Amino acid sequence: EDRYQSDPGKCFAHIRKRVNEHPDSDLIYALSELSYVEGKKAEKEGRLGDALNHYGISLTNSYDYLFSDDLEDTRNAYDPQFRAVCDLYNESLEDTLRLLCTDNKIEPGKTYRIETPDREFVVRAEMRGQWGPDEFDHYEFVSDYEIETLRNRHTTFGLGVPLIAVRKAPADADEREKYYAEGLS
């Protein structure tokens, strides 16, 4: 803790060196968590490049914690730390996507690149289902909304960032369009 408080950069370098020498789930978790905290600090201070880098480090190390073959024997899905890493992965991914997307809008069919000192990720916003990417204007983050009047709340836990697809107004005036709400999602 003292090393982190006095020089976070040296602390990260030390932890990363130890992780590279011997992948350890606790060290990977610590690196992911500290990187996420530093990303939040950098974003708040307007250092968006640094924030993106820290979120990327948190994202990649969280991913390694969850899926690396090196940790297969020690990983325990029932350990509360495992759930915390799942949350850290999701939060890092969402914050990374927010920084990559203008006005917090992810465009269908667009590819986003995330580069960290460790690796590069390519994230593609893909459509699944019968509607094509040209039928949507943008995606929005579900976490930007709060349900206030529905009594039933259905939550599915897992990895990823839930999005809302906002439909474009069609160019041709189909008679059925009058029955659709504006910005139908």
Role assignments for model-derived ranges:
Residues 1-27, 31-185:
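Flexible, membrane-associating and regulatory peripheral segments of lipid-active enzymes
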